[in-house]
């Protein structure tokens, strides 16, 4: 029964792979077969050994894609600010309440915020419950909106990777 389960999962993923990438070259068929078989085996072993670590890879990829998108968006905003003749900077300091508790999680969150142009992690409170962030742009002085963007954007994804 267990062997049948493996074959069904691999056959299903290979079929979806062929349907997704309709290419009739022999090399493409071998590549699809190899890749989908590898994914199927990883998926099956994740249930046997550690299901959580398998999905953490996808959460990490999601975090990296989100960070890259935010970095490019902020870079263009800062670059536009530099070349435009009129300044529209609305800078300020905010205290973001933290849900992350471990030192590594806090460090990664603070680093991601600091690497995004226009924001800088300044300090962490002694009880590790607040992260103080200097932001170059606080839209219309709406501090709560910026806090929500940090919490729903970076912090939520960091928590998903580590929990």
Predicted regions and their residues:
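Short helix-capping/hinge motifs at transmembrane helix termini and TM-loop junctions
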Residues: 22, 49, 84-85, 163
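Contiguous hydrophobic segments
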Residues: 1-15, 52, 56, 83, ...
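Short, flexible segments with low predicted structural confidence
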Residues: 32, 50-51, 84-85, 129-130
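Terminal membrane-proximal soluble interaction domains of membrane-associated proteins
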Residues: 90-163
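Flexible, solvent-exposed loop/hinge segments and secondary-structure transition points
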Residues: 61-103
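Membrane-targeting alpha-helical segments
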Residues: 1-79
């Amino acid at each position: 029964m267990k062997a049948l389960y493996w074959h069904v999962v691999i056959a299903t993923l290979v079929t979806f792979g062929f349907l997704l990438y309709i290419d009739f070259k022999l090399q493409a068929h071998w590549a699809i077969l190899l890749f989908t078989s590898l994914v199927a085996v990883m998926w099956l072993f994740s249930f046997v050994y550690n299901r959580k670590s398998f999905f953490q890879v996808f959460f990490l990829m999601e975090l990296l894609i989100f960070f890259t998108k935010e970095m490019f968006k902020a870079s263009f905003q800062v670059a536009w600010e530099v070349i435009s003749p009129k300044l529209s900077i609305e800078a300020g300091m905010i205290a973001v309440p933290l849900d992350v508790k471990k030192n590594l999680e806090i460090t990664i969150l603070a680093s991601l915020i600091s690497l995004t142009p226009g924001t800088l992690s300044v300090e962490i409170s002694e009880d590790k419950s607040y992260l103080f962030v200097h932001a170059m742009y606080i839209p219309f002085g709406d501090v709560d909106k910026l806090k929500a963007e940090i919490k729903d954007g970076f912090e939520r994804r960091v928590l998903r990777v580590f929990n």
